[in-house]
Regions:
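C-terminal amphipathic alpha-helical interaction region
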Residues: 25-28, 43-132
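Glycine-rich phosphate/cofactor-binding loops in nucleotide/flavin-utilizing enzymes
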Residues: 1-50, 125-132
Length: 132
């Protein structure tokens, strides 16, 4: 019986986190939290755009950030007009932000491992390539 409840708890927790992200965090400090994340990621992209060895990571990250920013603008515009717009898309938005954050972490890992010949670094790049 315990195992049957785990999925419900997981979904409920994700739903609560999604509502918190859209309802509180996104508007907190006039959106500066997400703006700061975007600036950090954009700076990383600019610094590493010419690195051929991690170009697939940078391209994936660029695409992901564009989607997050477009989705954020939509949420800000449509969520203000009708809160149901924001609430109904909160879980999808949470997933998008989470996957973008993971893409950023994989890109940073690839940069760190770039040019290192130890097997664990080569494995990290291969693993990251699989997930992005």
């Amino acid at each position: 019986m315990r195992d049957a409840r785990i999925a419900l708890i997981y979904e409920g927790t994700n739903g609560i986190q999604a509502l918190d992200l859209v309802g509180r965090k996104l508007t907190m400090h006039k959106g500066r939290l997400l703006q700061n994340f975007q600036k950090e990621v954009q700076q990383f992209i600019a610094e590493n755009k010419d690195n051929e060895n991690i170009s697939s990571f940078i391209k994936a990250l660029e695409d992901a950030v564009k989607e997050v920013m477009a989705s954020t603008m939509w949420l800000m515009q449509n969520g203000m007009q009708d809160p149901e717009n924001a609430l109904s898309s909160a879980s999808d938005y949470l997933n998008l932000v989470a996957l973008t954050s993971l893409t950023y972490m994989w890109a940073r890992t690839a940069k760190f491992s770039d040019g290192k010949n130890e097997p664990q670094h080569k494995t990290k790049i291969k693993t990251g390539t699989y997930f992005i």
